[in-house]
Amino acid sequence: MSGSDTSGSVHVDEHGHGHGKASSSYDGAGAPAPAPAPFQGHRKAGSGSSDVPFLLRSGGSGGDGLRRCLGLIDFVLRVAAFGPTLAAAISIGTSDERLSVFTNYFQFRARFDDFPAFEFFIVANAIAAGYMVLSLPFSAATIMSSKATGVKLLLLICDTIMVGLLTAAASAAAAMVYVAHEGNLRANWVPICLQFHGFCQRTSGAVIASFLAVFVLMVLIVMAAFTMPRRTHHTAS
């Protein structure tokens, strides 16, 4: 057959690089359009946590955000407990009232150093107030790092010691305040609050403030025990 159809002619590379390769004149006619590149956001990988508040970031563990929130509450409660302990120590330390009978040369006096229980109360509350201030940096460390197990354990032990110290001091002072208000007929102790109103008001308020600090410390102990990380034991399969 002498007829030649040029529509399907094969072009060969002139320089010999196209041996065995043929290109049809219709190569680009039915080529599909390139798929659009997937949309890439401006946010880099791993930067999605920047929009999450610091206290709620999990950091790879679901309970870390909750532990940071409880750490912040721990810090606030320590600041709040500093006030009652300091106020209780100052209130008892400045309690001094004199009662004049007939003349100024014959006086009765009610002062805190007349009662050893009140002296112990002042020392215990002063120690507790100082401890609250010193524990604030450690409490802040538990907020920044929820895995600070050693710091949490140290605070838990010291808080327990402070609870025992404050409870003993507040209980001893409360017993003295009760006797001052009610007296003891069997021991022939008369109530002195009928005459020394200011002294009894100061001591009563100080005891209430100290018990309030004890309650705050007990809450701190419960929170510390709740946020303490627990070890999981894996059994061999």
Swiss-Prot record:
Sequence ranges on the Extracellular membrane side: 91-117, 174-205
Keyword Nucleotide-binding listed: no
Cytoplasmic side: 1-69, 139-152, 227-237
Subunit and interaction comment: Homodimer and heterodimers.
Region (Disordered): 1-48
KW Plastid (keyword) present: no
Family, as annotated: Belongs to the Casparian strip membrane proteins (CASP) family.
GO biological process: cell wall modification; cell-cell junction assembly
Membrane topology: Multi-pass membrane protein
Assigned keywords, A-Z: Cell membrane, Cell wall biogenesis/degradation, Membrane, Transmembrane, Transmembrane helix
Top-level taxon of origin: Eukaryota
Subcellular location: Cell membrane
Full protein name: Casparian strip membrane protein 2
Spans through the membrane: 70-90, 118-138, 153-173, 206-226
Function in brief: Regulates membrane-cell wall junctions and localized cell wall deposition. Required for establishment of the Casparian strip membrane domain (CSD) and the subsequent formation of Casparian strips, a cell wall modification of the root endodermis that determines an apoplastic barrier between the intraorganismal apoplasm and the extraorganismal apoplasm and prevents lateral diffusion.
A cellular-component GO term for this protein: Casparian strip
InterPro entries: CASP/CASPL (IPR006459), CASP_dom (IPR006702), CASPL (IPR044173)
